[in-house]
Every structure is written in structure tokens, then in C-alpha cells.
Design a protein with these regions (language model features):
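Asp-based, Mg2+/Mn2+-dependent phosphohydrolase catalytic module
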Residues: 1-3, 101-104, 117-227
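A generic structural signal for short
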Residues: 12-13, 87-88, 110, 142, ...
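Conserved SAM-binding loop
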Residues: 13, 92, 110-113, 146, ...
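Secondary-structure boundary/capping motif
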Residues: 15-16, 112, 120, 149
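Residue-level detector of anion-binding/catalytic polar loops
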Residues: 34, 109, 187
Length: 227
């Protein structure tokens, strides 16, 4: 029986991935024009991880007028991201509110497991005061040492509730996130909100488009049939 549900945030709880693609596409064109798919390469990674991988080599900033250092340029990107997130639309994925309410009615513990940081969550809480009532715990990038696709975040989510990973379902939309859930040993429920069904199917135990018409009973049946 499913005892805990561990949700990614963007593309799983909120329909925000397309907005992030706009932001990171813009950043990619400015700093990495040689990577036309930059906004997709960074999906599921923390901000620190993005900076460490793509924004430490000073050659990246050679064309930036008034460049003073990688850390200073990273700070400028962070400031732009913070401002962008303040103005984002945080709309729930269709059917989410009914689905998570059904989970909680059946005693399923629910947590957010996200690569986003605390500042991002403060924006969420301001926009959706009811958000905290849906979740028993919110784990952000500050809570784990390894980023997705490493399973650390999902293992910590299961440990927080004192349950085995195999008694959890992890809900993800990104390739890195799906890999993290699968590596943790939890049931992997993929959402085709960011990538196509065909693309995420190999990394998922089951795929849904959104939560409309999907219930705890459906989830439990699917998990049992997969055993």
C-alpha cells in the first residue's frame, strides 16, 4: 500500500515549466548561444548545480561588457531569476487539488521534493496560502547534498515519514527527476506535462497527462498491478 507521495514542484504541482523555459532560454541565448537547447539541459537541476556546470568558466563571460567575475555574474542571473519568479503564474496542474485531497483522506503522507530553493517557496506561499495545508513536509535544494538525478532527495523524503522507498510514489515530469525516483526504489509516476508520453515512458512505471479523473484508488490499483 502506498504510504507516502513525494511530489516534484514545477510541472507536477504547478504548471510552470513553460515559463522557466522562457527564462532559461533567454539566459542560454545570452551566455551559451552554442547550446540552442540550453533551457532543456538544465531541467531538474538546482541553481547551484546549473552555475557549477555552466557558469564558472570565464570564457563564457568573455563577451559580457564590464565583466568582473563569475560569482558577480551568477549573482546578476540570480537577481533576474528572483524577479522573474515573483511575477510568475503559479497555476495548479489540472486536477491536482482534488487528487491530493483524496490522498490525504486516505492517510497518505505528502511531501514536496524540489530542486527549487527556499526563496522560491516563499513566493509560492505568498501566492497560495493554502499550499502548506496540502503537504506534511517541503524539501528544497537546501535540504539535500546531491541533486537529481541522484535519489538523495527522494530517499530523504521517505526517511522523513519513516517509510520504505518501495512504499512511496514519486511524481515527476523531468528526465532527471524520473531517474531520481527510479533510483530510489519508489514507484515512478510520470506526468506528461513537460515532455511527451513517449519520451518519459521508459523512465516511468506509469504515465498520466494530469490529475483529472485520477484518484487514490486508481493509483493503488496501478501500483498493485505493477508488482
Amino acid at each position: 500500500m502506498i504510504k507516502a507521495a513525494l511530489f516534484d514542484l514545477d510541472g507536477v504541482v504547478f504548471d510552470t515549466e513553460s515559463q522557466y523555459s522562457i527564462f532559461w532560454g533567454m539566459i542560454g541565448r545570452e551566455y551559451h548561444p552554442e547550446m540552442p537547447d540550453f533551457e532543456y539541459r538544465i531541467k531538474g537541476q538546482t541553481l547551484v548545480q546549473i552555475y557549477d556546470k555552466y557558469f564558472t568558466d570565464e570564457a563564457v563571460f568573455a563577451h559580457i561588457e564590464g565583466f568582473t567575475g563569475a560569482k558577480e555574474e551568477q549573482a546578476k542571473i540570480t537577481a533576474r531569476l528572483d524577479e522573474f519568479e515573483k511575477n510568475m503564474q503559479y497555476e495548479y496542474i489540472a486536477g491536482f487539488e482534488d487528487f491530493i485531497s483524496d490522498l490525504k483522506e486516505h492517510g497518505v503522507k505528502c511531501a514536496v521534493v524540489t530542486s527549487s530553493n527556499i526563496q522560491k517557496m516563499l513566493n509560492v506561499y505568498e501566492r497560495h496560502p493554502e499550499f502548506k495545508a496540502y503537504f506534511d513536509r517541503v524539501l528544497t535544494s537546501e535540504d539535500f547534498a546531491e541533486s537529481k538525478p541522484h535519489p538523495d532527495c527522494y530517499l530523504k523524503g521517505a526517511a522523513y515519514f519513516g517509510v520504505k522507498p518501495e512504499d512511496c510514489v514519486g511524481l515527476e515530469d523531468s528526465f532527471n527527476g524520473l531517474k531520481a525516483v527510479r533510483a530510489s526504489g519508489a514507484f515512478t509516476l510520470g506526468l506528461a506535462t513537460t515532455n511527451s508520453r513517449e519520451a518519459i515512458q521508459p523512465l516511468s512505471d506509469y504515465v498520466i497527462d494530469d490529475y483529472r479523473g485520477f484518484s487514490f484508488a486508481d493509483l493503488q490499483r496501478i501500483v498493485e498491478n505493477a508488482k
